[in-house]
Amino acid sequence: MTSGDGRSRKRACGVAVDMGASHLRFVLADADGTILEEVRDRVNGEAGPRGVIDQIRTGINSVLRPRADECLRGIAIGVPGGVDPESGKVVDANNVPGWREVDMGRELEDAFHAPVYLDNDANMAAIGESWRGIAKGIDNFVFIALGTGIGAGIFIDGRIRRGHSGFAGELFRMNVDWTRWNDNFTDTGYLEAQISGMALASEGRKLFTQGNGSPTGSLTDTRDARYLFEALRRGDGVARELVERAFVVLGVGVANVVSVLDPELIVFNGGIVQGAPELLLETVETVVQRIHPKPPRIKLSTLGDRAQIFGGLRTLLEPGEQNAIRPKSTHGRPN
């Protein structure tokens, strides 16, 4: 969204898209990052990649409609999965059915005639925290997203780090239980099978349907653990034991990350965090402090569900600085 003279910069705008496993959010912003329009939708995952791409195209058009689309200078999308830094394809999004090697960026560039930047949703959110959130001014930190799944965005020496194949920060695959190395967690991954929204919802459902505890809310949504946190807030002992156990596992995973990266700050965000923020911080801090003599600060995001959107806007404003990923077939087009 950078441009030469002041008049063209004032007219320039970009769209940031937050694509989760179950939600879509579209934000139109000007060249200074000021939000102008916003639209929300639910992901129709059963429609497959084709249907979701059509949803995204419709959402982008919706935020552009009140303003002339001539202002569009770029689109940034955070996706719930890995993005190949070479091809720009969505390699996989294990919580959205059918997403393997999807060239969404190229399709959207062809549709809107503007550069499209894609990244893992946790990476986008980490960029947002670095720009406008609690990690502003901090060069070395790890952003951890706890929602339907689990992932992380890693900042080292002031830059987002994606690794060799673009999968740095995929904490969901981390195994912190030596006795379960032979278990097959397939696309879920060990840590995600213990601490994600899907995992907690599933485990809570088993306990409560066996007559342990008395949850409120629906037990039918396989991804929604809100009923579990409602029971926790009512003082249900079964719910507390389940959640505490999951947070201890998370703490061990965080301690491993700290051992390797030595960050100054750990930032938590996501629906699971909102369910029991004080208990999560207390438990994770206790575990990490037992393992590390100089543990990092562990804090909650100050941006909430805006983190990924701000990361997308920052990517549009400074694509070179963020080493932003574009579809390979369109590399070389003018920005």
For each feature predicted by the language model, list its residue ranges.
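A charged helix-plus-loop insertion that forms the helical arch/lid used to bind
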Residues: K89-W99
